[in-house]
Regions:
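Domain-level signature for soluble enzymes in the chorismate/prephenate branch of the shikimate pathway
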Residues: 1-319
C-alpha cells in the first residue's frame, strides 16, 4: 500500500514538474518575442532621432539623455537593478542603430579614438626604445609590420615617450607587464601622461622560459585605417579601456561588461587598483576581445554613457 502511494506521489510530482517546465518555456518564448518587438521599436526611435538631428554628437547626446534618463528616473527602485540591465540592452540597441549611420559613427569614433596624427617624413618608421636584449627582441618583432623601420636608442623611459610626444619618432617601445610584477602601473602612468596609444604587444620570454616581459608598441594615434578596417583585421585585436569609479556606491564596470557582452566583445582581463587621489575608489583596466560587427555600437555606448572612459589601446598580439 505504501509503495502504491509513493508511486502515485511520484507520478503527480512528475506531472507538476512537466507542467511547470512547459509554462516556463511558454513564458520564455513570449519574453523573447516581446524583446524582439522592443528592439524594433528602439531601432525605429533611433532612426527618427538620427534623421531629426543636426548630426553633431552634442545634439545626439542631448536626445539620448532625454530618452533614457527620464525612463530610469521613473523606475521602481525595488527592481531598479533589473530595470537597469534592461535599459542597458535598450541603450545598446539604440547605439547599434545610431552607429549604422556613417556620418554619425565617424564623429563618435573620432571623439573616442582621436584623429590620425600626421607623421613627418623624418619620424616615419622611427622607433625609440632603451636598448637591451629584451627590447631588441621586441623591436625585431614589431618592425615586421612597420614600413621602413629604424631604431632610435634613448637613455631613459621618459625620453623614449618624449620622442613620440614631440613627433621625433613615430613609435616607442615600453614594458607594460612582467611575470614577476604583473601590470607595470608606473609605465601605464607614463602612457597616460604622454597620451600614447598601444598598437601592438609582444611577449619576450627569459632564456630559461620561466619568466616573461610584455612590451607595447605605442604611437600618438591608433594604427592608420582602423576606422574602416576589415573584420579580419579587427577580430584579431583587443581593446583596452581605463575607467574609474566616481563614488563608492557607483561602479561603471557592471554596465560596461554588460554592454560588451551584448556587443559580443569577449572579456579577456580586468585589473583594478586604488586611485592615487582617493584610495577608497578603484580604477579599472579592462581588456576585451573585439567583435567587428558591433564594435562601433560599443564605442558609441561608451561615448554616451561613460565619456570619462579612456581607450588605452587597440592592439594585436604579435607572434
Amino acid at each position: 500500500m505504501r509503495k502504491s502511494i509513493a508511486i502515485h506521489t511520484n507520478d503527480s510530482l512528475d506531472r507538476d514538474v512537466a507542467t511547470s517546465k512547459t509554462n516556463i518555456n511558454d513564458l520564455d518564448k513570449k519574453q523573447h518575442s516581446l524583446f524582439e518587438i522592443r528592439n524594433v521599436l528602439v531601432s525605429e526611435l533611433s532612426d527618427v532621432i538620427c534623421k531629426d538631428t543636426d548630426g553633431s554628437f552634442d545634439d545626439l547626446l542631448s536626445r539620448y539623455e532625454s530618452i533614457f534618463d527620464s525612463a530610469e528616473n521613473q523606475a521602481d527602485k525595488s527592481i531598479e537593478k533589473y530595470l537597469d540591465s534592461l535599459s542597458t540592452l535598450d541603450k545598446i540597441n539604440f547605439c547599434r542603430a545610431v552607429s549604422s549611420s556613417k556620418r554619425i559613427s565617424q564623429e563618435i569614433l573620432k571623439i573616442m579614438l582621436g584623429e590620425d596624427e600626421k607623421i613627418s617624413p623624418d619620424a616615419k618608421g622611427r622607433v625609440a626604445y632603451m636598448k637591451n636584449h629584451y627590447t631588441d627582441a621586441a623591436y625585431l618583432a614589431f618592425s615586421k609590420a612597420i614600413s621602413s623601420p629604424r631604431s632610435y636608442y634613448s637613455t631613459s623611459f621618459q625620453s623614449v615617450c618624449e620622442e613620440v610626444y614631440t613627433g621625433a619618432c613615430e613609435y616607442c617601445i615600453l614594458p607594460i607587464e612582467s611575470s614577476l610584477d604583473g601590470k607595470l602601473m608606473s609605465f601605464y602612468s607614463m602612457i597616460d601622461k604622454y597620451e600614447l596609444k598601444i598598437n601592438s604587444v609582444y611577449v619576450v620570454k627569459s632564456a630559461d622560459g620561466q619568466s616573461f616581459t610584455k612590451f607595447a608598441l605605442l604611437g600618438k594615434s591608433f594604427s592608420s585605417g582602423i576606422f574602416n578596417a576589415s573584420s579580419v583585421y579587427l577580430n584579431k585585436r583587443n581593446i583596452e579601456i581605463r575607467v574609474s569609479q566616481t563614488s563608492i556606491s557607483d561602479s561603471p564596470l557592471d554596465s560596461i561588461l554588460l554592454a560588451a557582452r551584448a556587443c559580443s566583445l569577449r572579456t579577456q582581463r580586468i585589473d583594478s587598483l586604488p586611485l592615487s587621489y582617493n584610495e577608497n575608489l578603484l580604477g579599472y583596466y579592462v581588456v576585451l576581445g573585439i567583435n567587428h560587427v558591433d564594435f562601433k555600437a560599443f564605442l558609441t555606448y561608451l561615448a554616451f554613457e561613460h565619456p570619462q572612459c579612456y581607450i588605452v589601446g587597440i592592439y594585436s598580439n604579435v607572434n
